[in-house]
Regions:
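Substrate-binding/catalytic cleft of secreted carbohydrate-active enzymes
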Residues: 1-176, 180
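Surface beta-strand/loop "capping" patches
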Residues: 183-190
Length: 190
């Protein structure tokens, strides 16, 4: 990375934080995703934490891992799997899932659609989600802290959303997902 590129990144990263600082829904700053342009990770994570100590810092979601920031974040597709743990930080699965289901007439690009794993019916896609959720629930006792499903909606040529690109059709059984997600959230209740 050139000095000019680094300076631009730092300037723009500060602008992002300044612009979004007052949004209480933001709980974590994530300066890098999947090692795309990742550089001086420890320095950037430390600066971010000093600049806004009120929020968690995820130094690199699914990227090259360093022992800095508040969490260790892995990506694994399609099913959830954790192959690293950190006893000093939250261990999270920043991306998993990608359950593809093509619904004609609700596609951004009808001739190009992709998912990590493809199914033909809502029932099949729901069953796969429930299977993954069961795996997540079992991982909690091993120190697993959080997960982010890819993804809420279809986007452009990716058909792995829980709802279609146009937001008109929910592609899975909402009640079954709510039930399993609630059970995961309550799994640590005594």
């Amino acid at each position: 990375r050139s000095a000019e590129s680094e300076e631009t990144y730092r300037k723009e990263w500060k602008e992002v934080i300044d612009c979004l600082y007052s949004y209480p829904c933001i709980g974590t700053w994530v300066p890098f995703n999947e090692a795309w342009g990742q550089f001086k990770t420890q320095e950037i994570a430390e600066w971010t934490k000093q600049y806004d100590p009120s929020r968690l810092v995820n130094p690199a979601s699914g990227g090259n891992h360093y022992t800095c920031g508040d969490m260790l974040d892995l990506h694994h597709y399609p099913g959830p799997e954790m192959f690293l743990y950190d006893a000093q930080r939250a261990t999270v699965l920043g991306e998993y899932g990608g359950i593809g289901l093509v619904l004609k007439d609700h596609l951004w690009e009808p001739n190009r659609n992709w998912g990590y794993i493809q199914f033909n019916t809502s029932a099949e896609a729901t069953a796969e989600y429930l299977k993954y959720a069961g795996i997540l629930k079992d991982m909690i006792s091993r120190g697993f802290s959080a997960a982010v499903y890819t993804q809420t909606t279809d986007v452009e040529v990716e058909v792995n959303g829980l709802m279609t690109y146009d937001r008109k059709v929910i592609k899975v059984d909402e009640q079954k997902l709510k039930k399993i997600n609630d059970s995961i959230c309550r799994s640590l209740d005594k």
